[in-house]
Regions:
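An N-terminal assembly and electron-transfer interface module characteristic of large anaerobic redox
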Residues: 1-240
């Protein structure tokens, strides 16, 4: 039997499908080999059209896990300090909230974080955005600041973080300029009677970071020895 005969004998068929699994609307090519086996091509993920075996166990949602690790923290202060520090659930707080939460609570301050993002709140405050081509996370920050203002916190903490913590011996850990300086935009267009604290911070150098934390917290009436102990715990939590 020749190869041409085998190819002509084959009952292979193909058809075009349109995946409705998300807004990408991928065009999928389905090849049916006539023996119960099929092959899909053109898909950008394998959520609905997969060439591998279907797992019996549903995979974990890494974003839900990260969100829980970052923000599911009990607010238990070590004293009866009445100061409520508001922190926006936005921008670099998705990396640094464990550090600041631990530092402040160990110093006896109450940490109040803004609520989860939602589109209706975003639309309500998007008019405050100064530039249309700014990134979406920055645009979203305005609704989180408004949320903290509505919670009537005593102060809003939005540090001017120039350098992030270095990893893997890279030469530079310079922060995104928008993330670094967006507090200046907030202060210009969203000012209120609630103070906006924007201390300069660098996570690249431990000694510098400790001094910056001491400068800020002593201005709030926290004693140096308490800050130093809290700093050690905040470091450990940030590295965990």
């Amino acid at each position: 039997v020749s190869l041409d005969d085998l190819l002509n004998f084959s009952s292979n068929t193909s058809k075009t499908l349109n995946c409705k699994g998300c807004e990408n609307n991928c065009t999928i090519r389905c090849y049916d080999f006539g023996n119960g086996r099929r092959y899909f091509s053109g898909n950008r993920c394998e959520k609905h059209f997969t060439n591998g075996e279907t797992s019996k166990k549903k995979g974990d949602n890494i974003y839900e896990i990260k969100n829980k690790l970052l923000f599911s923290r009990t607010i238990e202060t070590k004293s009866q300090h009445k100061l409520n520090i508001g922190i926006a659930r936005a921008l670099n707080m998705f990396e640094e909230f464990p550090f600041w939460h631990t530092l402040f609570t160990e110093c006896g301050l109450n940490v109040i974080i803004s609520d989860d993002s939602n589109f209706s709140e975003y639309e309500k405050y998007v008019r405050m955005v100064m530039s249309d081509n700014i990134c979406f996370p920055a645009k979203l920050t305005h609704s989180h600041i408004a949320n903290l203002q509505n919670k009537k916190v005593d102060r809003i903490f939005m540090p001017f973080v120039i350098y992030e913590k270095g990893e893997n011996n890279e030469q530079n850990s310079y922060n995104c300029p928008i993330v670094t300086a967006y507090s200046t935009v907030i202060g210009s267009v969203q000012a209120s009677d609630i103070p906006l604290d924007t201390p300069t911070i660098s996570f690249r150098n431990r000694e510098t970071l400790l001094k910056q934390c001491l400068d800020y917290l002593t201005s709030l009436g926290i004693k140096k020895d308490i800050i130093e102990k809290a700093f050690l715990k905040a470091e450990a939590e940030h590295a965990r």
